[in-house]
Amino acid sequence: MSATSSHDLGRTIVPNTRMVNQNWWITTLLINSHKYCPPLTRDIECDVLIVGGGFSGISAAAEFLRKGLRVVLIEKNIVGGSSSGRSAGFLTPDSELELHQLVRRYGTAAAAEIWEAPCRGIERIVSTLKKYDIQCGLLQQDSLFLGLGSGGTEAVESERECRESVGFTDQRTYDASQLQQILGAQGYTAGIRYGGTYGVNPLQCLQGLKDLLIDNGMQVFESTEMDRIDDHTVYTHAGTVTAQNIIIAVDKLPDAISPLADETFHAQTFLSVTEPLTDRELRILFPSGEQMQCWDSKLVYSYFRLTGDNRLLLGGGTPVTTFLKDAYNNPGVIRRVIKDFRSHFPQLDDLSFIQFWPGQIDVTRDLLPVIARPPGLEHVRFILGCVGIPWATFCGSFAARNVLGEADDDYRKYFNYFSNERHFVLPSGLGKVIGKPLLFSLANSWAKFYQVDTLRAPAEAQKEF
């Protein structure tokens, strides 16, 4: 099918250019070489086994550096080859929940504690990338939350009030006319901006961190999937790993591995990328010359930022495909997202989007992560439903520090929010009756807009994770 084009004031507009269905981050792996990690083909033993090479698993592994322990990491794809390496690479504490939603759910003090977790995740990633000079397109980009309509304006105002209530001072709000100074868009009614956030190529980041782990003596086996776990031993297709402690940080956890699979749900989004923008296009997008990572106030929101080589990365979805049980791979969804973007940026109608790819992220019913230690498997910790790179990074570090006995203070602070024993409005078993997509759709909307939580006192007995 050939591209269709039209002309508007001398500009050629190509809204239906055929896009290649391919993860752009995979394409960028051709730029730098990384260590080859063959599959596991023998039986080995270690002190700590980490299953999963996304941001949770890699962050957990990094906690064991220079601890004198034998650490092994296995990944069914390449490190970063699953959800983490298909993401937009936003390093922001915002994910599925805005700060004002956390304040409503938990109160000001608790919301501040929760918000601190992804902020620590960002600090951990950025400091490591800078310390070891890992080349992965790291860019400092302020976050800009964009309101649509009167509801979006109210959300922006609520976010401002909540940021002030928890003590943040770096935020700035914009009305529709003021937004024109920093964003060449139309149709947004308000915005709130804050700093301390970044963009990164997530796949290059994880591959670079993998190389760092290997250089420090860790064993990494790619193309090695966990088939089952029996006490202290994880079985793969061609080998086994027996470990004193095991951290399982995988997405799309199979039911056969653990009933904790019932705690995870999927949200699907789509991403697309353009050719590098010209200087003129960059000035249209960000008139002030300051790059930002942006997202809007829709329930299924659209989001965009620039990459290190000045390509526009644009993502979003639809209410239907977001909650589907199985992956849906069709360019029609991202074309609608692109069409909506062009309605806000008519001067960028001629941008050429060259690649697109879908991705399913793991989430929980209330949109906060779960860290769990199953009864009878006290040496095993699961990390589930971390939406956003900073959240995953913090949770991986947190789980590892619990193994090391170095997280008592953080445990008392965070067990309320991350334990799978916390209160959920709708039970996971309801998914077997009405289906997991419908259950997640209901629970997701409730958590975002209505849920109010009651905090528990720390248990005096054995820790929950």
Where are the regions a protein language model picked out?
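C-terminal catalytic lobe of FAD-dependent flavoproteins
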Residues: V320-F440, Y450
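Glycine-rich FAD pyrophosphate-binding loop
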Residues: R66-R86
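Active-site substrate-recognition segment that forms the wall
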Residues: E123, K131-L139, M226, T240-R280, ...
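Helical element adjacent to the flavin cofactor pocket in flavoenzyme catalytic cores
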Residues: E161-C162, Q186-Q244
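Helix-loop-beta segment of a Rossmann-like dinucleotide-binding subdomain
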Residues: Q135-F145, S177-G208, G317-V320
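Dinucleotide-binding Rossmann-like beta1-alpha1 core, especially the glycine-rich loop
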Residues: D94-S177
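N-terminal Rossmann-like FAD-binding beta1-loop-alpha1 element of flavoenzymes
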Residues: V48-L73
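Extreme N-terminal leader/targeting segments of oxidoreductases
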Residues: M1-V48
